[in-house]
Regions:
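A short tyrosine-centered beta-strand micro-motif
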Residues: 75-81
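Acidic, glycine-anchored loop motifs typical of Ca2+
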Residues: 85-93
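Bacterial Sec-dependent N-terminal signal peptides
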Residues: 1-19
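Surface-exposed loops/turns
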Residues: 29, 61, 73-74
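Short, flexible loop/turn segments at beta-strand junctions in immunoglobulin-like
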Residues: 26, 68-71
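A short, amphipathic beta-strand motif
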Residues: 20-26, 134
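Short strand-edge motifs at loop-to-beta-strand transitions and within beta-strands
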Residues: 63-67, 119-121, 130-132
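Beta-strand signatures of extracellular beta-sandwich domains
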Residues: 35-39, 80
């Protein structure tokens, strides 16, 4: 019996890494880059400048684009992204602090007056291959 418990504990420590495919919709074709970050906790998300995993990719010829993150550990993640149209490496805002560039969060959360909480936008990654959709929109959409 003890060896069965050891066997279960041993192999539970070695969950296979997860691949997350993200289908991004609503992009402005051939304009700037997409800056996308994955945050694995509320504390990490509060420090938006330092995501746990990140990518910057050029926007292609289509309004829809797919990227993948590989080797992710199992857990909850918030995915946040924006299209940096002018290449200044930040999401542009007007004088009221309202974003003027398109952005998206996991769970299709799209708050207009506040940043979503980690729990509102977090997704659970458990299977070796997961796929989500991000719909990019501007505040006025």
């Amino acid at each position: 019996m003890l060896h069965i418990i050891f066997y279960c504990l041993f192999f539970s420590l070695f969950n296979p890494p997860i691949t997350l495919e993200i289908k991004m919709e609503g992009l402005i074709p051939e304009k700037g880059t997409i800056r996308i970050g994955l945050y694995n906790s509320a504390a990490a998300f509060k420090d938006e400048a330092n995501p746990n995993h990140a990518q910057v990719v050029s926007v292609g010829k289509n309004a829809t684009q797919i990227i993948t993150f590989e080797g992710l550990p199992e857990g909850k993640y918030l995915v946040a992204a924006y299209q940096d149209v002018n290449g200044n490496k930040k999401i542009d805002k007007n004088i009221l602090g309202i974003p003027t560039e398109a952005y998206a969060f996991s769970n299709d959360v799209f708050p207009k007056w506040k940043t979503p909480s980690f729990n509102e936008a977090a997704i659970k990654l458990e299977r070796p291959y997961e796929s989500i959709r991000l719909r990019f929109r501007t505040w006025i959409d």
